[in-house]
From Swiss-Prot:
GO terms for biological process: regulation of cell migration. This is Somatostatin-37. Its main location: secreted. Somatostatin inhibits the release of somatotropin. PANTHER family: SOMATOSTATIN. GO terms for molecular function: hormone activity. Keywords: Cleavage on pair of basic residues, Disulfide bond, Hormone, Secreted. It is found in: Secreted. The lineage of its organism: Eukaryota, Metazoa, Chordata, Craniata, Vertebrata. It comes from the Eukaryota. Disulfide bonds join C26-C37. Belongs to the somatostatin family. Residues 1-2 form a propeptide. Transmembrane segments: none annotated.
Length: 37
């Protein structure tokens, strides 16, 4: 919910969030959809 809200609210936040998720092994969320996580 947090990620989806941030993405819908501010695309700029998607970048830092994506990088953090990448380290967590959740790159699918950044590339395709949040549900992929």
């Amino acid at each position: 919910a947090l990620r989806a809200a941030a993405v819908a609210g501010s695309p700029q936040q998607l970048l830092p969030l994506g990088q953090r998720e990448r380290k967590a092994g959740c790159k699918n969320f950044f590339w395709k959809t949040f549900s992929s996580c």
